[in-house]
Amino acid sequence: RQMCIRDRYDNNSRTLPWRVSFNSPQKLYYRILSEFMLQQTQVKTVIPYFETFTSKFPNIESLAKTSLDDVLSLWSGLGYYSRAKNIHKTAAILEKDFNCSLPDTLEDLMMLPGIGFSTAGAILSLGFKKPGIILDGNVKRVLLRMSGNKSPMNQYKTEKSLKEFAKILLPSTKHKQYSQGLMDLGATICKPKNPECNMCPVCLLYTSDAADERS
């Protein structure tokens, strides 16, 4: 399962402005900024805001040293303004305590303002190539269908069981490709309605519910 998800990502990955080379000096900044912006917001909405934001604040240091008013001004229209306040606070902490870099443990990441379990998992996996569990809406939908779990997505009990299932699926290598492949699968193939099961690399693992949703 993990291999076919990674293979599909290698051959069909989306081109997104925050997906830069792993050796890029902007990698970690782009990753944490995009994760904040993508919380409860679709990719197509985030892209122009991300590009404008990074042209004004190209790194953690520049973001940390600007005023909150400037941050909120660029964030205007994206909504959920607590995210803007939290990324500004986080940038200040990263500049002061982490030399404008990011901590690389789940515990330290979750100490930063606005970063929960899933966002920390995304940073670990995509920013550091370490094991990290991502449970955004797209990934949760894929995992629900793969596991045959029919419970409502956002129930505490459901999230707990999905977290355990996600741990089982974590590969031993290539964490970044697997995580990005899982997110891309949920965004482009395993959609909420009319999923394209005939194009899914793990369609044989889907429950009959996913097929029913195509009709």
Language-model-derived ranges and their functions:
Residues K65, A211-D212:
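Intrinsic disorder/low-complexity segments
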Residues S215:
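Post-transcriptional modification and biogenesis factors for structured RNAs
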Residues R1-D7, Y206-A211:
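Conserved small/polar residues in nucleotide/adenosyl-binding loops
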Residues R8-E196, V202-L205:
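Catalytic cores of DNA base-excision repair glycosylases
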